[in-house]
Amino acid sequence: MGKFMKPGKVVMVLAGRYAGRKAVIVKNIDDGTADRPYSHALVAGIDRYPRKVTATMGKKKIAKRSKIKAFVKVFNYNHLMPTRYSVDIPLDKTVVNKDVFRDPALKRKARREAKVKFEERYKTGKNKWFFQKLRF
C-alpha cells in the first residue's frame, strides 16, 4: 500500500479534544521515533471555525466573524482519517515544528502562525470546504 499521509493532506481528527476538526499535515513520520515508536504526524488544524457571513453585514461584523482559532499537535495515525483533499497552505517550518512542544512560548507562536495563514487563505475564498464545520 502506498504512503498517503503526506504534508498538505487534509485529515479529520478522530480522538481527543479536537475530535471532528479538520487539520492539515505539516510533517509526517511514518516509521516512528525513539520517543514515539509509532507512525505519527504533526498537524495544524482549526479549533474554532469562522462563522457564517452574509452580504448585509458590515465590515466590522464580517471581520469579527471571520476569525479562526488554530491548534498545532502531534497525532498518532490511528487518530487521523485522511481525506481526498489537499491544501497548499505555506506554514513556516521554522516556526511550526516538533520542537515547539518543549516551550509554551514557541507553541503560542506556532499556533499564531497557523491562525494567520488559515485566516489569510479563508479571506481569499479558496479551499471553502476546509473552513466549514463538519456536520455530524
Curated annotation (Swiss-Prot):
Q: Which organism is it from?
A: Danio rerio
Which cellular compartments is it found in?
Cytoplasm, Cytosol; Cytoplasm; Rough endoplasmic reticulum
Description of how the protein assembles with itself and partners: Component of the large ribosomal subunit.
List residues of the KOW domain.
5-40
Keyword Cytoplasm in record: yes
Query: InterPro entries annotated for this entry?
Result: KOW (IPR005824), Ribosomal_eL27 (IPR001141), Ribosomal_eL27_CS (IPR018262), Ribosomal_eL27_KOW (IPR041991), Ribosomal_eL27_sf (IPR038655), Translation_prot_SH3-like_sf (IPR008991)
Which GO cellular component terms are attached? cytoplasmic side of rough endoplasmic reticulum membrane; cytosolic large ribosomal subunit; large ribosomal subunit
Instruction: Indicate the family of this protein.
Output: Belongs to the eukaryotic ribosomal protein eL27 family.
Chief localization: cytoplasm
Protein's name according to its UniProt entry: Large ribosomal subunit protein eL27
> One matching Pfam family, short form?
KOW
User: Which GO molecular function entries does the Swiss-Prot or TrEMBL record give?
Assistant: structural constituent of ribosome
- Function summary: Component of the large ribosomal subunit.
Biological processes per GO annotation? erythrocyte differentiation; translation
Question: What lineage does UniProt assign to this protein's organism?
Answer: Eukaryota, Metazoa, Chordata, Craniata, Vertebrata
User: Keywords assigned by UniProt?
Assistant: Cytoplasm, Endoplasmic reticulum, Ribonucleoprotein, Ribosomal protein
Q: What is the superkingdom listed in this entry's lineage?
A: Eukaryota
